[in-house]
Amino acid sequence: DYVANYVKANLPQYAALPVLSVSAPFKSGFGGGTDYTDVAQGNVAINNAADLYLYPNTVYAVKVSGADIKNWLETAAKRFNQINPALTTPQNLISSFPGYNFDMFTSKDISYEIDVTQPDISKGGSRIKNLNYKGTAISPTQEFIIATNNYRASGGGSFPGIDGSKTI
């Protein structure tokens, strides 16, 4: 709501655009089996909250197209290895791609599927299927405002099209 309210109050030229948010887990097992945040039952302490968000990032907003969102998600989907459904032996689903680059759009207004049977974007594949906003397919030219952090907005993680030039 912070970014949506800021846009409405300070950037009226973008007020009609949908505002979505994206985030990534910082501790998601990338560093091994202990690379998770364990919050014990009961009161949450300051160190629990600090353990969830490790970096001094700030909130930024970027104006992107539907094509940018798809490429953003395709890059995040590199978190998963390609799975061969014909194999009956176990296959590792999680790749060595850092969890802090596994950006997820979590708004109820956006939905998508990640097809891990397809190669990832770095191999010319397309894993993101059924990318919708409010139940309707997102057009490559449709515009959105995305709340993210300054690291990602400035090009951190090498996400296609997110290079600092789209910050509003």
Regions found by a protein language model. Give the residues of each.
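Feature captures C-terminal
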Residues: 2-168
